[in-house]
Curated annotation (Swiss-Prot):
PANTHER family: RIBOSOMAL PROTEIN S19P FAMILY MEMBER (PTHR11880), SMALL RIBOSOMAL SUBUNIT PROTEIN US19M (PTHR11880:SF8)
Source domain of life: Bacteria
Native species: Carsonella ruddii (strain PV)
HAMAP family documented for this protein: Ribosomal_uS19
InterPro entries assigned to the protein according to its UniProt record, in alphabetical order: Ribosomal_uS19, Ribosomal_uS19_bac-type, Ribosomal_uS19_CS, Ribosomal_uS19_SF
GO BP: ribosomal small subunit assembly; translation
Keyword list, A-Z: Ribonucleoprotein, Ribosomal protein, RNA-binding, rRNA-binding
Protein name: Small ribosomal subunit protein uS19
Role according to the record: Protein S19 forms a complex with S13 that binds strongly to the 16S ribosomal RNA.
Family that this chain belongs to: Belongs to the universal ribosomal protein uS19 family.
GO MF term set: rRNA binding; structural constituent of ribosome
GO CC annotation, single: cytoplasm
Amino acid sequence: MSRSIKKGVFLHKSLFLKIKNNKLENIKTWSRNSTIIPDMIGININIHNGKLFKKVFIVEDMIGCKLGEFSFTRKFKSHSKKIKRKKK
């Protein structure tokens, strides 16, 4: 379900202030639900995934997405494949 247009996008207040003040430095944030806005283009943002901070460089294609979409919280682990052996 999408967010109402009259409410606008969500951006954490402290994250917004850091973007306005520090244009070129790395910004560390725990706010995964903040929306990427055009002012963020070209900034490195360290997004917390619950254990570590993952460094993400913001580009134009990311505008309108949430920060949490680029820092996965779960590690993908696949099952091992069976190896077919040649018969002698």
